[in-house]
Amino acid sequence: AVLRVPGAGIRPYNGMIAEAEDGLITLEIGIHGVPVTMDLVIYNNLLYGGLNQYQYMNWDNRDEIYFKRVYIGCVRAADYIFSMDEFDGENLIVYGGSQGGALAIVTAALDPRIKGLVSFYPALCDLNGYVHGRAGGWPHLFRNSTESPEILKQKTKNTPYYDVVNFARKIKVPGFYYLGYNDMTCPPTSMYSAYNTITAPKVLEIMEEAGHFSYPELWPKAKAWIYTHLQVNQ
């Protein structure tokens, strides 16, 4: 089975249809607690309304940070797959890019049932980077900080609980990772800060000229890695 976790934003999803046709159980989730098959206008209303800039919400309160529910929700998605009679009860890989790349690492770190992960250009790495004079990962907290010293201190105290670097340390399963050296959304230095802490078996694909995107030839490599680890014929 493959659990696909989403990149940033608020939008509908179509599911991993080709992989499902190959016989995999696939589950693609959103993170905002709303159905993922509604009209686009509904998501746009949320994007520019109540969920506008959700990635910056409540960093001054450790237990109210938006991503707390998101991280827990990813594990609950794995629970759902494990509840399915069709699932073999063992072979589950989590996959995502950007925010989803972060969530893939987080989910694999939190849930020992997951057997592997695929993470493209993960976000949420080295969140306090800008405080120390280097580029932090998306969502670029503190890049143009106007917080008072007291609020800044509180926020930088809370971020390690959500920093992907601290989840990457706990990875114990094989992973397929990808980054580009011209990525301004998730700077490669921030991604390396997570990648370098991973001691589990890992494959790294680098496309030096790439920004925050991947070339078409990357997905077949990642897909082949997934199918090999799930013992699925292509």
Regions found by a protein language model. Give the residues of each.
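Short beta-strand element of the alpha/beta-hydrolase
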Residues: 1-9
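The serine-hydrolase catalytic nucleophile loop
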Residues: 8-22
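Cap/lid segment of the alpha/beta-hydrolase catalytic domain
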Residues: 18-21, 25-72, 129-138
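Gly/Ser-rich "nucleophile elbow"/oxyanion-hole loop immediately N-terminal to the catalytic nucleophile
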Residues: 53-98
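Hydrolase active-site cap/lid region
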Residues: 101, 105-151, 206, 214-217
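Active-site nucleophile elbow and catalytic-triad environment of alpha/beta-hydrolase enzymes
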Residues: 151-167
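Short beta-strand/loop motif that positions the catalytic acidic residue
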Residues: 170-171, 177-179, 183
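C-terminal catalytic histidine-bearing segment of alpha/beta-hydrolase fold enzymes
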Residues: 185, 192-234
